[in-house]
């Protein structure tokens, strides 16, 4: 059987305990099941056969209960009950499970559960919030970095001054001969000058394009072939020859009619002419030549 008074006299009443921490003001207890963290008779988990406490494991709160019936079984000494994440429901669970426990233990369990929930909420807020990470540096490293920065600034100022001087001399045309200057700065100055000239030429081209806006031009059709043009020329020639034939036939008919009228007038005598005089048109004669291929002589065998 477990005797609480005997255990307390041996452990807590000015005797040795492995969980006890002595200070000038009071004594503390390092046992994980201690409900208050103080070393006294009412809060000692070893000297109380009916005991309860609250523990947190990986963000989840559990209620641990100990009864005298399980004192003979150390493997089943503590009964664990998982508490709800809702604060009010968890308090109701504590009241339901600790009906027959002392009021002091019930009150301290609720108080411990409140503290645990508060620091869990604070942990969640800190994890979501960004924090500054302070990295300590030695004095030697700081001095070295400052010297490097100063040297880099001086070198940058010197390079800028050299570039400005090169640009001024290049504009003035002072480089008739070869000089021993930094090649990179000289090349950079030349590139800047080339960029400026290229921008001017592009501006001139844009002005020319603006001037050409609104002009009208005739463009040859790419779909017309030379064979089509030759066909059109042949058609024109045929049309011209047909017109000439018509004109020649008309002129011949008119001349024959005039001759007949003249013969009639001579036979009847002179008669007064009526109407307008008919003027004779110039007569055009057209001759056509046909070329025939000469017959080849038969070879005498």
Curated annotation (Swiss-Prot):
Gene3D superfamilies: 3.30.390.110. Pfam families: Mak16 (PF04874), Ribosomal_L28e (PF01778). It is found in: Nucleus, Nucleolus. One of its GO terms (cellular component) is nucleolus. Keywords: Nucleus. Residues 191-301 are annotated as: Disordered. Residues 265-282 have a biased composition (Basic residues). InterPro entries: Mak16 (IPR006958), Ribosomal_eL28/Mak16 (IPR029004). Belongs to the MAK16 family. This is Protein MAK16 homolog A. It comes from Xenopus laevis (African clawed frog).
């Amino acid at each position: 059987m477990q005797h609480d008074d005997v255990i307390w006299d041996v452990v807590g009443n000015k005797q040795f305990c492995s969980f006890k921490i002595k200070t000038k003001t009071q004594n503390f207890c390092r046992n994980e099941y201690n409900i208050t963290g103080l070393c006294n008779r009412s809060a000692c988990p070893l000297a109380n056969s009916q005991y309860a406490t609250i523990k947190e494991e990986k963000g989840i709160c559990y209620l641990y209960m100990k009864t005298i019936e399980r004192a003979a079984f150390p493997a089943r000494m503590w009964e664990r009950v998982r508490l709800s994440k809702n604060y009010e429901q968890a308090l109701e669970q504590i009241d339901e499970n600790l009906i027959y426990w002392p009021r002091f233990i019930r009150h301290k369990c609720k108080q411990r559960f409140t503290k645990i929930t508060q620091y869990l909420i604070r942990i969640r807020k800190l994890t979501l919030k960004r924090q500054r990470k302070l990295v300590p540096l030695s004095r030697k490293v700081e001095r070295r970095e400052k010297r490097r920065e100063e040297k880099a600034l001086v070198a940058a100022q010197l390079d800028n001054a050299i570039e400005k001087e090169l640009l001024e001399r290049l504009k003035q045309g002072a480089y008739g001969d070869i000089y021993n200057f930094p090649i990179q700065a000289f090349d950079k100055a030349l590139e800047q000058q080339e960029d400026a000239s290229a921008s001017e030429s592009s501006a001139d081209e844009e002005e020319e394009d603006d001037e050409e806006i609104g002009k009208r031009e005739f463009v040859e059709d790419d779909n017309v072939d030379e064979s089509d043009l030759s066909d059109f020329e042949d058609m024109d020639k045929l049309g011209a020859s047909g017109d000439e034939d018509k004109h020649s036939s008309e002129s011949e008919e008119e001349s024959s009619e005039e001759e007949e009228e003249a013969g009639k007038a001579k036979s009847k005598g002179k008669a007064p002419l009526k109407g307008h005089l008919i003027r004779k048109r110039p007569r055009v004669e057209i001759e056509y030549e046909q070329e025939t291929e000469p017959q080849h002589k038969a070879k005498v065998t």
